[in-house]
């Protein structure tokens, strides 16, 4: 029973009212039932990411009372949660009531929460559970508005690295009206390149650029697309493209031994089923040889057989670009039995490979 109720009972006793213990217990039971009913009613109002995805487009604007000119990320998430209440955002906001709260990590599950007000970012991760998760971030616009994005995800119990269902909600916040209005942009319009690929959104905690990955159950390594922020809007997705070599390296070369990748990149590997999304890195290893063909911009990593044996290609790579116009990677090679040589590969943006 609440303290106020206890104080009231004490006052009634002092004034001679005959409030029996049985009656008090009955009141407590009734109050407990009412609280349980209220909790159940609140739970019934909570929406799943799938429900929000189905209804959000028709939801309209969201009021942000007291948002002012510089609303922080918690204020915007709170306004969203009033219009579209979910368990995961409610949980985050409960912790965010403490202005000093920044992070929580569940050591048992690997999940947790982050509340970075300074960088305009919050998240809830599921770890190795099947709970829902979310990310939200805010961007400053040159016209004084804010771009607010929140992504709510239902975890796939069979593959936690891929979303089961998700709701990506994007708003423009107007400080004059203290209102968030749904917005379409390059991110919301982006579609997967194949029907069996799912999209994975990654909002930035630091920096301003956003990434979207494509992956499926068979191939978990995502092909990432980058969206650059220009202060007002996102660019169209930057295509991954074929590479050009800045230095011609001929012959058979072996990578220098290394525990860290010397160059990482996405590739498209052709097999009997057509183009396949691959994620690749050049690691230093004595078990593989690197063959570089400069005339068509391809690289073959092959198994390292005994001296004099033919080597069958293990991976046939066509480099694809990350977000930069130009990306240069340096790695060290040594010819079989020879001296170590430094090689450089530069990737440049061109026409999409497919």
Task: Outline where the language-model segments fall.
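N-terminal glycine/threonine-rich, aromatic-flanked beta-hairpin/loop signature
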Residues: 259-297
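Terminal domain-start segments
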Residues: 24-140
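Short aromatic loop motif centered on NTY/YTY
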Residues: 179-243, 290-292, 301-320
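Mid-length scaffold segments of soluble, non-membrane domains
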Residues: 142-185
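C-terminal motif of bacterial Sec signal peptides marking the signal peptidase cleavage site
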Residues: 15-16
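Structural signature of eukaryotic scaffold interfaces centered on beta-propeller domains
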Residues: 135-143, 200-206
């Amino acid at each position: 029973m609440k303290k106020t109720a206890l104080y009231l009972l004490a006052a009634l006793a002092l004034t001679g009212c005959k409030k029996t213990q049985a009656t008090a217990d009955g009141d407590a039971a009734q109050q407990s039932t009412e609280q349980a009913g209220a909790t159940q009613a609140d739970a019934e109002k909570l929406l799943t990411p799938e429900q929000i995805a189905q209804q959000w487009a028709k939801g309209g604007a969201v009021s942000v009372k007291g948002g002012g000119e510089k609303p922080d990320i918690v204020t915007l998430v709170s306004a969203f949660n009033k219009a579209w209440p979910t368990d995961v955002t409610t949980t985050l906001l409960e912790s965010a009531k403490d202005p000093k709260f920044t992070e929580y990590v569940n050591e048992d599950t690997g999940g947790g929460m982050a509340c970075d007000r300074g960088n305009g970012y919050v998240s809830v991760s599921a770890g190795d559970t099947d709970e829902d998760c979310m990310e939200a971030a805010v961007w400053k616009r040159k016209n004084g508005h804010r771009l607010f994005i929140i992504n709510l995800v239902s975890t796939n119990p069979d593959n936690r690295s891929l979303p089961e269902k998700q709701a990506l909600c994007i708003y423009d916040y107007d400080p004059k009206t203290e209102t968030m209005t749904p917005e379409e942009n390059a991110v919301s319009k982006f579609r997967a390149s194949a029907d069996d690929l799912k999209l994975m959104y990654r909002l930035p905690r630091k920096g301003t650029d956003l990434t979207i990955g494509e992956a499926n159950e068979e191939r978990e390594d995502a092909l990432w697309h980058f969206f650059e922020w220009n202060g007002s809007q996102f660019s169209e997705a930057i295509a991954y493209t074929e590479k050009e070599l800045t230095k011609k390296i001929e012959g058979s070369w072996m990578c220098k031994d290394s525990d860290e990748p010397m160059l990482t990149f996405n590739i498209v590997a052709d097999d009997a089923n057509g183009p396949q999304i691959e994620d690749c890195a050049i690691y230093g290893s004595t078990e593989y040889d690197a063959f570089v063909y400069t005339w068509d911009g391809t690289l073959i990593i092959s198994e390292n057989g005994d001296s004099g044996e033919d080597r069958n290609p293990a991976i046939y790579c066509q480099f694809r670009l990350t977000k930069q116009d130009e990306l240069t990677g340096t790695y060290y090679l040594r010819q079989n039995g020879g001296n170590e040589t430094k090689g450089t590969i530069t990737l440049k943006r061109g026409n999409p490979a497919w």
